[in-house]
């Protein structure tokens, strides 16, 4: 019975699956690990240990410690990841685009467009006309958008609503937070309507 139990334990390889409170790869018992630590132990404890092991302390000092397995989570890479993520965010904000929400009075849905795709106001307005199936007409600084019941407006960084086309294109792209296509009657206070 005992032979069959012993062979069964060998087959299970209990030693390999045993849970210990040591570093990975250290197969030595806990007592020997404490003897090799950098901390000093009391002289009585070291005498007792050498007597119980039946060996001299000098023999243990000559033994080369086993190669240590790399500890999980070392070397620390958190700062590397932080810096890497920051660089990616900066690249995305500079190169990939600037998406803004576009809403239209009376439309039950919103759209998002990338302002970096367009090079000027006429391109942007043409895209908005195609997207919402409406016509804005011609823009003039004096009269706003003529021949249309809708006026494209935008909210800048300060939270002010302005007519699209009031400022130079580059300034518009850098300051636009969202676009709204208002009815001409709503946009009277913003421009020359």
UniProtKB/Swiss-Prot annotation:
Provenance organism = Vigna radiata var. radiata
Keyword Repressor in annotation? yes
Q: Which UniProt keywords apply?
A: Auxin signaling pathway, Nucleus, Repressor, Transcription, Transcription regulation
Q: What is this protein called?
A: Auxin-induced protein 22D
Q: What does this protein do?
A: Aux/IAA proteins are short-lived transcriptional factors that function as repressors of early auxin response genes at low auxin concentrations. Repression is thought to result from the interaction with auxin response factors (ARFs), proteins that bind to the auxin-responsive promoter element (AuxRE). Formation of heterodimers with ARF proteins may alter their ability to modulate early auxin response genes expression.
Subcellular location per the Swiss-Prot or TrEMBL entry: Nucleus
Subunit-structure text:
Homodimers and heterodimers.
Q: Name one GO biological process term.
A: regulation of DNA-templated transcription
Q: Which gene encodes it?
A: AUX22D
* Region spans: Disordered: 16-68
Main location per the UniProt record = nucleus
Domain comment in the entry = The N-terminal half of the protein contains two conserved domains I and II. Domain I includes a slightly degenerated ERF-associated amphiphilic repression (EAR) motif which seems to be involved in the activity of transcriptional repression. Domain II is required for the correct degradation of the protein through the SCF-mediated ubiquitin-proteasome pathway. Interactions between Aux/IAA proteins and auxin response factors (ARFs) occur through their C-terminal dimerization domains III and IV.
Kindly list the organism's lineage: Eukaryota, Viridiplantae, Streptophyta, Embryophyta, Tracheophyta
Q: Does the keyword NADP apply?
A: no
């Amino acid at each position: 019975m005992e032979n069959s139990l012993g062979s069964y334990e060998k087959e299970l390889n209990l030693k390999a699956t045993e849970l210990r409170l040591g570093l990975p790869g250290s197969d030595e018992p806990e007592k020997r690990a404490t003897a090799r630590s950098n901390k000093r132990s009391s002289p009585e404890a070291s005498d007792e240990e050498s007597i119980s092991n039946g060996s001299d302390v000098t023999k243990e000092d000559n033994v080369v410690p086993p190669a240590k397995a790399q500890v999980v989570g070392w070397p620390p890479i958190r700062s590397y990841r932080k810096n890497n993520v920051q660089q990616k965010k900066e690249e995305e904000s500079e190169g990939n685009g600037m998406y803004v929400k576009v809403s239209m009075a009376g439309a039950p849905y919103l759209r998002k467009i990338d302002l970096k795709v367009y090079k000027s106001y006429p391109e942007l307005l043409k895209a908005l006309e195609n997207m919402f199936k409406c016509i804005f007409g011609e823009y003039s600084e004096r009269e706003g958008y003529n021949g249309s019941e809708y006026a494209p407006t935008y909210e800048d960084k300060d939270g002010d609503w302005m007519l699209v086309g009031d400022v130079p294109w580059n300034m518009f792209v850098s300051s636009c937070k969202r676009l709204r296509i208002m009815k001409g009657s709503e946009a009277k206070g913003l421009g020359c309507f």
